[in-house]
Amino acid sequence: MDEAGFVQTQPNRSAWTETGEVHLITAARGKRLNVMAALISTGELFTAKFWETTTAALFGGFLGLLLESVGRPLTVILDNASIHKAKEIQPLLALLKEKGLTLYFLPPYSPELNRVEKLWHKMKYEWMAFKARNSAGLEADVDKFWTVSALIIE
């Protein structure tokens, strides 16, 4: 399980300038589409997307919906992001634990162990065209990958 953010304007990955000149990159930020995804052992991808900032409360809600959707005891493998361990959601996490949820935290700085990280990398750097988008275009581009993405993650 992991979170990622997608912005309307792609970041500059490289630039070209004459030797001795400074290349200035202006900081232009558009709206950010945040996505949470969990890869289920069946190969299904459970996702949620939202334009709001990713918070511990949204994370807790996502876990509740995930557990309800799967409908059986569930172990979620995740990183050590602060929203995953926030004090404000500890009562909710305790309740979800009683309902069959177990959280397994990966070692720090080990994104290669999180299979959903592979999805984010492919979406951001391989599949999505390097272009500016409006909000609707960004959401449509992110949506079109959900149907094939679970098959790609290995």
Model-derived features with residue positions:
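Short functional hotspots at interaction and active-site rims
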Residues: 1-154
